[in-house]
């Protein structure tokens, strides 16, 4: 009897070993709760990774299906709707952030009623609110995005953005006579709108990982991040054209209301789109790394794991320099340009943003095809440093001819071309380095660190300008400091940036998994499905 039983068990074992892991139920099923219908369907849809198909998402997509051997991964058209929500949210929010930078005098008189006279003007306070809020709300955005899902994060981000835009619009109504009330409402609306950054700045990497296959992740990140400089371009060009002949008085008292009303309509569009997002993530994962990604590390532990990773800390510094040096320089540059005889309004910032958007798309395509993330970062840091040093040297002398503004535009375009691609590529590299830390957490740490630098650098520029060292024109030393910081980023990228691509290692490996080892992935664990 015992011999018969042993033969039966041996036969069962031989049959089980022939069943692919992707469809095999673990042997210890009788010791566990029975699989629900949802878990079973997810298991059968290819959420597991088997020995022969770890690198499934290396294959290009065909008709929405990514296949390799017995595992099937799938992409859905709805991914473009999810991406559009993030893109238009970023564009709208960036426009609200930068819209008053080129109108500092007009904004000062309309909202405060008197010149700044050495104090912080209204436009600078509005800009700094966005950086300050991004630092302190970023952790909440990271937690909600990773634990409540993309749909919830998108709804919260678009709601905060449209509410903030509405309050800013109310603040611009001419019937409000008190300048104190106007300025208070403006800053309150800016505070609420700035809170939306906590979501859309960490959503790109999450959307790319959960909805897009391996050969589209970098471009998905790029599209999300270039929406930000596109918003910056709109936020500088539109007010420069709209307020070209503006004079403070009754004749133009509705100009600010019309401008903020337009930004309100733009903020309302992504909110409507977010209402059509029906699920947190697709039923079938688009890639092997997405299928294997489990949220079982813990939020605090994930942050510590990022901060204690030396390579990630180097990437944090590079990302912070790229983000803060570019935008703080473009805001600061208005003074030196006027001092040297240029009358260019906000157009250098717009040129910087437009050129940076185009080069980011190119960099994203190259990254998707070659996976050379660190090489792109190195080229960008060197190019940015050369551009800012050249601009500093060129502005040493006042303008002397009609070609000088063209040179300034070219140099500003180079600043954007070499700095803006570092945002999406840097986030993608951060996810690779910290895998399997959840995407919103790793990208959120990068963004928070960048926002912190963006909050500090303008004060550093203002302080160094007030020191009046070495030069009769104090802004020259402030630009020298910017050049020095850009050189630090060059040294870090060339000699210390040596990341390990952990996510690609998972996707490319033909790992020697035991054929008897059960595999439970992110999509087969009910709790993790709920979290993501």
Regions found by a protein language model. Give the residues of each.
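Cytosolic juxtamembrane N-terminal segment immediately preceding the first transmembrane helix
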Residues: 2-8, 19, 26-95
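Extracytoplasmic gate region of multi-pass secondary transporters
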Residues: 100-101, 309-356, 457
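Helix-to-loop junctions at the C-terminal end of transmembrane segments
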Residues: 137-150, 359-372
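Cytoplasmic membrane-interface "Motif A"-like loop-to-helix N-cap segments
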Residues: 147-158, 368-382
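Cytoplasmic helix-loop-helix junction between adjacent transmembrane helices
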Residues: 191-226
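Glycine-rich segments within core transmembrane alpha-helices of 12-TM secondary carriers
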Residues: 218-244, 447-457
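Symmetry-related core transmembrane helices of the 12-TM Major Facilitator Superfamily/SLC fold
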Residues: 257-276, 477-495
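C-terminal transmembrane helical hairpin of 12-TM major facilitator-type secondary transporters
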Residues: 374-425
């Amino acid at each position: 009897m015992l011999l018969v039983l042993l033969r039966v068990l041996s036969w069962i074992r031989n049959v089980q070993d022939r069943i692919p892991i992707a469809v095999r139920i673990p042997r210890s099923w009788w010791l566990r709760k029975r699989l629900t219908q949802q878990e079973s369907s997810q298991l059968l849809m290819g959420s597991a990774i088997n020995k022969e198909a770890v690198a499934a998402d290396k294959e290009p997509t065909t008709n929405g299906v990514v296949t390799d051997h017995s595992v099937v991964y799938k992409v859905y058209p709805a991914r473009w709707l999810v991406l559009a929500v993030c893109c238009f949210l970023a564009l709208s929010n960036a426009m609200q952030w930068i819209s008053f930078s080129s109108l500092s005098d007009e904004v000062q008189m309309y909202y405060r009623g008197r010149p700044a006279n050495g104090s912080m003007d209204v436009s600078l306070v509005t800009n700094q609110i966005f950086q300050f809020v991004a630092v302190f709300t970023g952790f909440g955005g990271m937690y909600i995005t990773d634990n409540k899902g993309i749909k919830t994060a998108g709804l919260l981000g678009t709601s905060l953005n449209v509410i903030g835009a509405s309050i800013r619009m109310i603040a611009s109504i001419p019937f409000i006579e008190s300048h104190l009330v106007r300025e208070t409402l403006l800053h309150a609306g800016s505070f609420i709108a700035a809170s939306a950054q906590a979501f859309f700045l960490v959503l790109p990497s999450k959307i790319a990982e959960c909805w897009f296959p391996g050969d589209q992740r970098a471009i998905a990140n790029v599209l999300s991040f270039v929406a930000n400089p596109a918003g910056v371009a709109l936020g500088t060009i539109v007010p420069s054209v709209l307020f070209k002949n503006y004079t403070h008085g009754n004749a133009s008292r509705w100009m600010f209301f019309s401008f903020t009303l337009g930004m309100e309509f733009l903020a309302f569009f992504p909110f409507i789109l977010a209402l059509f997002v029906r699920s947190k993530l697709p039923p079938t994962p688009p890639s092997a790394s997405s299928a294997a990604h489990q949220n079982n590390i813990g939020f605090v532990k994930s942050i510590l794991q990022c901060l204690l990773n030396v390579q990630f800390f180097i990437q944090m510094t590079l990302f912070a320099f790229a983000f803060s040096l570019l935008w703080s320089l473009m805001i600061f540059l208005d003074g030196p340009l006027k001092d040297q005889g240029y009358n260019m309004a906000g157009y250098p910032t717009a040129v910087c943003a437009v050129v940076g958007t185009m080069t980011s798309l190119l960099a994203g395509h190259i990254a998707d095809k070659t996976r050379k993330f660190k090489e792109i970062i190195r080229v960008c840091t060197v190019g940015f440093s050369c551009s800012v040093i050249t601009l500093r040297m060129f502005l040493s002398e006042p303008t002397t001819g009609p070609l000088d503004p063209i040179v300034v535009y070219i140099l500003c375009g180079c600043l954007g071309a070499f700095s803006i691609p570092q945002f999406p590529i840097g986030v993608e590299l951060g996810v690779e380095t910290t895998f399997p830390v959840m995407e919103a957490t790793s990208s959120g740490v990068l963004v928070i660190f960048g926002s912190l630098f963006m909050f500090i650098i303008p004060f550093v520029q203002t302080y160094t300008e007030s020191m009046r060292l070495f030069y009769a024109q104090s802004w020259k030393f402030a630009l020298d400091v910017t050049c020095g910081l850009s050189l630090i980023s060059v040294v870090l990228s060339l000699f210390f940036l040596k990341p390990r691509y952990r996510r690609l290692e998972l996707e490319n490996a033909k790992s020697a998994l035991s054929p008897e080892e059960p595999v439970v992935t992110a999509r087969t664990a009910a709790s993790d499905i709920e979290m993501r």
